[in-house]
Amino acid sequence: MSTADLMRRWVIALLLAAAGVAAEDSCSRNEFQCRDGKCIASKWVCDGSPECPDGSDESPETCMSVTCQSNQFSCGGRVSRCIPDSWRCDGQVDCENDSDEQGCPPKTCSQDDFRCQDGKCISPQFVCDGDRDCLDGSDEAHCQATTCGPAHFRCNSSICIPSLWACDGDVDCVDGSDEWPQNCQGRDTASKGVSSPCSSLEFHCGSSECIHRSWVCDGEADCKDKSDEEHCAVATCRPDEFQCADGSCIHGSRQCDREHDCKDMSDELGCVNVTQCDGPNKFKCHSGECISLDKVCDSARDCQDWSDEPIKECKTNECLDNNGGCSHICKDLKIGSECLCPSGFRLVDLHRCEDIDECQEPDTCSQLCVNLEGSYKCECQAGFHMDPHTRVCKAVGSIGYLLFTNRHEVRKMTLDRSEYTSLLPNLKNVVALDTEVTNNRIYWSDLSQKKIYSALMDQAPNLSYDTIISEDLHAPDGLAVDWIHRNIYWTDSVPGSVSVADTKGVKRRTLFQEAGSRPRAIVVDPVHGFMYWTDWGTPAKIKKGGLNGVDIHSLVTENIQWPNGITLDLSSGRLYWVDSKLHSISSIDVNGGNRKTILEDENRLAHPFSLAIYEDKVYWTDVINEAIFSANRLTGSDVNLVAENLLSPEDIVLFHKVTQPRGVNWCETTALLPNGGCQYLCLPAPQIGPHSPKFTCACPDGMLLAKDMRSCLTEVDTVLTTQGTSAVRPVVTASATRPPKHSEDLSAPSTPRQPVDTPGLSTVASVTVSHQVQGDMAGRGNEEQPHGMRFLSIFFPIALVALLVLGAVLLWRNWRLKNINSINFDNPVYQKTTEDELHICRSQDGYTYPSRQMVSLEDDVA
């Protein structure tokens, strides 16, 4: 090979290598190339958090060239950032330079609203009503004495209520004066009472609540009027117990154990338990003393055992030898060395650093978390945008608002308090509510009326209400709406049940009922087919189950006493609940793991009742404080007062389109008949795995699913029929197409069945049931045949199959013999026997051998 050819090959190799390097350095269309050649996602450029090692993705030169879209606002300034237009002048600073809240026109109230001195707007109904609805109290500043109309009753506190509510056995005035004997003129109000009495294991508060009897005289008020702590003996601790500063008792072994067991933390005060020297500038001698770090290796003995003056270590820098054995950073100490790790890494085996997966920790990000080497990245779900100033995910679009119950009404308040009105006035005792955002509809339950209602939100003030459920309700404390499949779910604490119905209230079914259960609040996840509810029975718990009533189990059973409200943050996949006994807000993931206590506060969580999640905030109602509070849902910090001077605020929900994401209604989009082919209810099934059914059929109470898994039969009929036809579960998967195996009871009497007319069922469905009943009756008739006939019906098919197999074998043998070259002998005996054996007769049952004859040699010889 010549020198020129060799040089030419070297040039080609170098060009190919350069092209490969260039190809590796180039980034894809959706990526941004840092100055050092690293590629990052384009959406991370100029988001306020540097991802490039050299910081070039957040440099002023890069970000100043960013052009905002038409529906965005440019923050401008040194580093231009883009935010949604809807965040402009919303009362919250989103730009670093506050430019999104500068030059905003003053907010004006509508002609029908009252403007508070702080600029907020409230409904004129709230002015001079005895409650401070403006945070500055300006709505009650210049009010005259309250006068009630002729159709109203004046409470002792000057509040006006409808006359029909007075002396009805249900306390409506804050002071209870509407039920005082002197105001009722001796009328019997006990017979009119609508509140359910407490059980024998519960204590009836003077304020009408029911609490566990074990909570009476426990040193903590649980009743709203604190009647559970009246006339209690002074508590004294046993000799083996420690008395906390608040008077409560704990076991003596829990004092000074480095854990706070007393609520006031007094069990860890004044403890002397030194196991190491305090502060980084202290050195612990091997002999136990603590000396200043400056005295180490100063050629003077300060430790009794001279451990502060080791001759070899004091003059040696261990980091010079193989970096001290450290994988990243080595820090030389006066005695020895120490391995350190950069930010985003942790030290393992004292020498090696490994990346920390921050995304494994709950609530690292408000929504999505992307783990990177040495760091992590927070992202937002669809419908949200990362706030460049606060680094939290904010909803895009119109501002959200709170809907909450206020005893006799449902109120509506925007999050910036620019609007505060009464949405549903003149209610009796509303306790639970939920919404259907797409249809702009609200649902609520009334504890006194024992009914569930519904109304369009833009028509609600006109008293245009629809009664959804009006029968068989006792205490509907919890309510949730499946906005995808158009169903409602509610709890009833008296029978201890969870039920479901369509949003029209035509079809309903009880999904869960358990003695001793006291279900309270409920929340649904129709995207994945699950429901969750709190239960303050004995023992208290949080339960989870499918929206069709299957796979019900407990998620939380420990460190829980009085769980009230519960809510689900779909974006982060976490459940939040309040505990009125523990005065806390806690959260777990939807599988019951990664539990976290968000906030504990006996003052602002005196008696929390319900809560709602939106963006980075948690909102909750408190019936003792008669107020609504908010806090950071990740840290529990930044607690603020949202509304006060309310009348028994209980349920609260957040109304915004991002709280109810879209999903697929498989009951309407399948290839089956409408309603999934179900005769009655079509309920979503829990999506436990990739092969889980999408929905199941369900029947009303007192009826069971038939063998086709879609139509319904009365439970009475199934008892009269055979065990086989009645052993069908009331809720089954829609993917099942074969009826279950069943046994036959020969001794069961033959009883005719009639088609069942069920409310809400069509004529076609009734015909289906009748046809199936006839089929069952035909099957029943066969059971009465003699045992001999049954034996023949089983034996004959088996014999026929055996004959067919035998004939096939003979045909194969015949074919094989015909294709074999054989030698014929003249021996007549041999010839006769072989001819007989090869002679095959064909009968109507197939090929069979003829009866074999016995031939004697003596006969032939003769």
UniProtKB/Swiss-Prot annotation:
Topological domains annotated Cytoplasmic: 813-862
Repeat (LDL-receptor class B) residue spans along the chain: 398-439, 440-485, 486-528, 529-572, 573-615, 616-658
Keyword Nucleotide-binding (UniProt): no
Residues exposed to the Extracellular side: 22-790
Topology in the lipid bilayer: Single-pass type I membrane protein
Key words of the record: Cell membrane, Cholesterol metabolism, Coated pit, Disulfide bond, EGF-like domain, Endocytosis, Endosome, Glycoprotein, Golgi apparatus, LDL, Lipid metabolism, Lipid transport, Lysosome, Membrane, Phosphoprotein, Receptor, Repeat, Signal, Steroid metabolism, Sterol metabolism, Transmembrane, Transmembrane helix, Transport, Ubl conjugation
Region listing for Disordered, in residue ranges: 730-761
Keyword Membrane: yes
Name of the protein in question: Low-density lipoprotein receptor
Organism: Mus musculus
Taxonomic placement: Eukaryota, Metazoa, Chordata, Craniata, Vertebrata
Name of the coding gene: Ldlr
